[in-house]
């Protein structure tokens, strides 16, 4: 095993402060960094010796022999489940990285329904209230090509359900709903059996479109409530918890295990084919290159390596370490060459940032001459990440396409969701605009359909009584 690099910022908030120094011996589960503000504890994921403590990371030289045992977390009251979650350093494992101990620190039984925005909830009465409070389990595995969440349901459904029940207990929620795409038949059947005797836990089936895993999309699909870009799920008396996060909660409470490993998918231009390689319980801090080698190694010349998913991931390097929020490592085919042609960028809250899209345009040898923003992309405050007004439901992109045409674009690169991409295609090609999606090189690599015209229904039949 190569040196393990454990970043000091693996969560929403400020970087943690190291509490170890070079030369210190550490074990799996040794606490090595603590929050300086909003954040979560960080632990060693291996047995070894601290080589360096840098400004942004702790470098550990692993021992040749790695034991399975770990140092258990300790709290004043072992019956305090929320304290165990906080001490374990658990964050949103789906990519957001918000500290779970803070997210679960709410009493949903005493949380009132917020006032809804009538403009985005025209079908609901002004005085609409939800009768129950909910834990919503995000099992959408939203990013195409990733498979580790579904694998965890198939192999560890009992652990996941235990974690969900702990979330309900901690927040005083009276119901829980699993949000999962209908296409995952095997996982759904396993989940149905796992919750058969759980009267307050049900399943909501999702269509296979992007971005069904966006937090507010999960609330909308499960509860029929549209939240504004400023509202949290608590406005709908709910907390959204990622599937893998729920499993980590069960580990913290049942085993006193700190958050030191990550499940992820390695896929793409890999020797042996483009099938998904799912790795469970990978030590946090292992390098991207080491995992690619475990999957078979890169097959020849490639375009880029992405950490995360095709939509929201970022280009990375072989020596970059994985974190608590890493979901995918994608090795792509080479980019097409646009030979300096004029390019327009359509930036969407559901996809990459403008910076990421400019990077893609540069790798395609395109000249960016126009940048438009999806009209549903809202910037809540200057510099904040964009949020979609109604994730997955798009009113149209004709105005933006007309601007691209006016700016003499030959190509446009879009980062839109399934529905927005569909509306781009309704007018863009008719105006002579050639369309690329920012995910095209990934989709072609993994054999997934391109995001253009929407060919699947946004409505799916549900299980009887959610069971």
Annotate the PLM regions.
Residues 1-18:
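Acidic, low-complexity mobile loops and tails
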Residues 149-152, 183, 372-463:
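Cofactor-cradling patches in redox/metallo enzymes
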Residues 114, 118, 174-288, 294-301, ...:
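Hydrophobic alpha-helical positions that pack around
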Residues 154-170, 359-361:
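Histidine-anchored nucleotide/phosphate-binding helix
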Residues 342-389:
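Redox- and metal-dependent alpha/beta enzyme cores, enriched for Fe-S-associated oxidoreductases
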Residues 92, 135-149, 378-384:
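Gly-rich Lys/Arg/Thr-decorated short loops/hinges at beta-loop-alpha junctions or inter-strand turns
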């Amino acid at each position: 095993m190569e040196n393990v690099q454990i970043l000091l910022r693996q969560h929403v908030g400020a970087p943690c402060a190291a509490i170890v120094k070079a030369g210190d011996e550490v074990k799996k589960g040794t606490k090595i960094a603590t929050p300086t503000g909003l954040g979560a504890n960080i632990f060693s994921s291996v047995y070894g010796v601290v080589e360096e403590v840098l400004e942004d990371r702790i470098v550990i030289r692993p021992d040749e022999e790695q034991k399975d045992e770990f140092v258990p977390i300790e709290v004043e009251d072992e019956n305090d489940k929320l304290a165990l979650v906080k001490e374990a350093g658990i964050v949103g494992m789906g990519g957001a990285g918000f500290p779970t101990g803070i997210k679960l620190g709410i009493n949903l039984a005493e949380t009132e329904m917020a006032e809804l925005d009538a403009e985005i909830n025209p079908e609901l009465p002004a005085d609409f209230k939800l009768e129950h409070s909910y834990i919503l389990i995000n099992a959408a595995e939203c990013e195409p090509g990733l498979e580790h969440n579904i694998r965890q349901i198939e192999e560890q459904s009992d652990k996941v359900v235990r974690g969900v029940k702990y979330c309900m207990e901690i927040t005083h929620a009276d119901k829980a709903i699993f949000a999962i795409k209908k296409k995952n038949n095997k996982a759904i059947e396993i989940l149905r059996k796992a919750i058969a005797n759980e009267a307050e836990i049900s399943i909501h089936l999702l269509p296979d479109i992007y971005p069904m895993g966006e937090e507010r999309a999960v609330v909308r699909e499960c509860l029929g409530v549209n939240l504004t870009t400023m509202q949290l799920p608590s406005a709908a008396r709910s907390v959204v918890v990622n599937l893998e996060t729920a499993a980590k909660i069960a580990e913290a409470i049942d085993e006193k295990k700190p958050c030191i490993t990550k499940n992820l998918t390695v896929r793409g231009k890999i020797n042996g084919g483009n099938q998904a390689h799912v790795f469970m319980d990978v030590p946090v801090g292992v390098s991207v290159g080491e995992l690619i080698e475990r999957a078979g190694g890169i097959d020849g010349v490639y375009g880029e390596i992405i950490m995360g998913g095709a939509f929201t991931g970022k280009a990375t390097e072989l020596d970059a370490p994985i974190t608590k929020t890493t979901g995918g490592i994608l090795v792509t085919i080479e980019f097409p060459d646009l030979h300096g042609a004029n390019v327009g960028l359509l930036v969407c809250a559901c996809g990459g940032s403008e910076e990421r899209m400019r990077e893609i345009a540069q790798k395609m040898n395109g000249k960016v001459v126009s940048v438009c923003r999806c009209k549903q992309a809202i910037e809540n405050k200057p510099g904040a990440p964009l949020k979609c007004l109604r994730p997955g439901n798009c009113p149209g992109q004709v105005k933006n396409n007309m601007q691209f045409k006016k700016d003499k674009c030959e190509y446009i690169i879009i980062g839109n969701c399934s529905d927005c991409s569909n509306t781009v295609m309704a007018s863009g090609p008719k105006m002579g605009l050639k369309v690329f999606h920012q995910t095209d090189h990934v989709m072609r690599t993994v054999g997934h359909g391109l995001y253009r015209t929407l060919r699947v229904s946004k409505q799916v039949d549900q299980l009887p009584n959610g069971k």
